[in-house]
């Protein structure tokens, strides 16, 4: 890994800072684990925008990632590390003795030739996957399941990690980077180590067009719009909106609680928003 600052040969390159990864595979991805991916540009089945500021961007193919890690006790060998346009983390292509290949989220410290294995008896080293009840306290983990057998849902982005803080009965207590502490069933699986590409946040895209390549459209303030487009729009000259901040649909924002799923609240011991 190396940070490279480009020469200011144009305004668009003046502020570019790239993260160079010479260890990544230069060729095409492994074809049997690649699917086509259609962009919906954040529209639902009615064609209405559900998430603003999305659309365009370069075409992508989806890499099928093994989030379940259910090849019990079979040691696999990492063939190569690859770039994945669909996530910030790198992915690793793992070859198993029976000839099957799978993509996994590449942990920090795993490289070409590394061995990874899943199971209760797996050694505690980066890339191995075990039930939380078999992981020692204080271990750094990622790729954490919320429901047994469903596959990893938490701690999957570049540089992310969590810590196994305690075990209480059928639950394991996990401390997240965000400050949240929560309970998860101890039979759920997690992988050892932290996710690769921790330098992802050090890059600088340098220009708006680089955001557009990634499918991100401009962010326009509500007070700069017309009344038909936003509750803060309109007015003579520059105005402050004339009311408490609201979303485009008129709901209060900046602190207004929108969370509905109350049934999991008893699993959260310490909220990430509370200092």
Swiss-Prot record:
Q: What does this protein do?
A: One of the primary rRNA binding proteins. Required for association of the 30S and 50S subunits to form the 70S ribosome, for tRNA binding and peptide bond formation. It has been suggested to have peptidyltransferase activity; this is somewhat controversial. Makes several contacts with the 16S rRNA in the 70S ribosome.
- Return any one Pfam family short name: Ribosomal_L2_C
Q: Which UniProt keywords apply?
A: Ribonucleoprotein, Ribosomal protein, RNA-binding, rRNA-binding
Q: Where is the composition biased (Basic residues)?
A: 209-219, 254-263
Q: Tell me the protein's name.
A: Large ribosomal subunit protein uL2
Q: Name the encoding gene, please.
A: rplB
Q: How does it assemble?
A: Part of the 50S ribosomal subunit. Forms a bridge to the 30S subunit in the 70S ribosome.
Q: Does the keyword Aminoacyl-tRNA synthetase apply?
A: no
Cytoplasm recorded as keyword:
no
Q: Name one GO cellular component term.
A: cytosolic large ribosomal subunit
SUPFAM superfamilies attached to this UniProt entry: Nucleic acid-binding proteins (SSF50249), Translation proteins SH3-like domain (SSF50104)
Query: What is the scientific name of the source organism?
Result: Coxiella burnetii (strain RSA 493 / Nine Mile phase I)
